Structure formats: structure tokens, C-alpha cells
Design a protein with these regions (language model features):
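Eukaryotic Ser/Thr/Pro-rich intrinsically disordered, low-complexity regulatory regions
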Residues: 87-88
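Secondary-structure boundary elements
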Residues: 21-23, 79-82
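Loop/helix-junction capping segments adjacent to catalytic residues or to phosphate/diphosphate-binding pockets
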Residues: 36-37, 68, 82
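Active-site acidic catalytic loop and adjacent metal/ATP-binding pocket
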Residues: 1-42, 52
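Short, surface-exposed, polar/charged, turn-prone segments marking secondary-structure boundaries
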Residues: 36-38, 55-57, 115-118, 129
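ATP/Mg2+ or Mg2+-diphosphate-binding catalytic cores
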Residues: 99-147
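Active-site activation/catalytic loop segments of kinase-like enzymes and analogous catalytic loops
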Residues: 43-79, 95-106
Length: 147
């Protein structure tokens, strides 16, 4: 895994794996992808899924139109250093690729959950990856500390 480290990370903090009470996240579930990693990898996974870092056309809730602002909030809330921010966008792309390789592998192996998810998410995943590559400069600028 890229960005290997010494922290134990969930690696799939999508909203289906979070338990909410009264509108607040109180627990993570489903640790089948947990592994060692770094803070940057953890922020990349969370921001990718929670900001969410994808085209506005693929965001159908109150987060629509606020992707770059929410990405900045993630970097700021985690207190990322300038060197960590410098590699965060690369980590987002690597995290996206890594997770979808896991999903594709599960689908190829006949795992029903992965197969169902991949058939529904493939097009969005491809659109999102293309957007990351087109918007890399914009994504980096959104998390660069301002003087």
C-alpha cells in the first residue's frame, strides 16, 4: 500500500461504515480493510469520501458545491503540515486507485458485495479519477496555507 506507516487506519471510512447518533459520528464499523498507514493516507481517505472529493454532478446532498472548501477544512482540522499538504492530493489519487483495485479484485473473485458495488460505482469512479487529474492544481491550491 502506498503511504505505509505505523498508525492503524480503517481505510474505508465511507458513510455506510460510520455509526451516527443524533447526527454525530460515534463509531466506525467494518474493519476488514484496516492496515498500517500514515496520517496523510488517513486524511486522503476521509476527505475523498466525506468532502466528498468528486465532481459536483456526483454530489446530491448539502455538500454539493463545497468540495474545495470541505477539502480545506479536512486539511486544517487535522493540522496538516506544509509537507503533508504537499503530498495530500497525490495521496487522494493513490487512495482512490488503491480502494478501487481492492473492489475490482473482490468483484473478480466473485464477492457479491464488491460485485454489486462495482457495477453501480464503476462509472462514477472513472469520472472521479479523471476529475482528480484535471483538477490537481485546483485541489492543491485549495489546501495551500494562505499568508
Amino acid at each position: 500500500m502506498p503511504f505505509a506507516g505505523r498508525l492503524v487506519l480503517h481505510n474505508d471510512p465511507n458513510l455506510d461504515n460510520v455509526v451516527f447518533r443524533h447526527g454525530r459520528a460515534v463509531a466506525l464499523i467494518d474493519f476488514d480493510l484496516a492496515s498500517p498507514g500514515t496520517r496523510v493516507w488517513d486524511v486522503a481517505a476521509a476527505a475523498r469520501l466525506w468532502a466528498p472529493l468528486r465532481l459536483d454532478d456526483d454530489v446530491q446532498d448539502a455538500r454539493h458545491g463545497r468540495v474545495l472548501h470541505r477539502f480545506r477544512l479536512f486539511a486544517d482540522a487535522y493540522g496538516l503540515t506544509e509537507p503533508e499538504r504537499a503530498v495530500l492530493v497525490d495521496a487522494v489519487i493513490a487512495n482512490h486507485d488503491w480502494l478501487y483495485e481492492v473492489v475490482q479484485g473482490g468483484a473478480r473473485a466473485g464477492h457479491a458485495g464488491f460485485s454489486d458495488y462495482w457495477s453501480a460505482a464503476r462509472d462514477r469512479a472513472e469520472r472521479t479519477r479523471s476529475w482528480y487529474l484535471r483538477a490537481t492544481t485546483q485541489l492543491r491550491a485549495s489546501i495551500t496555507p494562505q499568508p
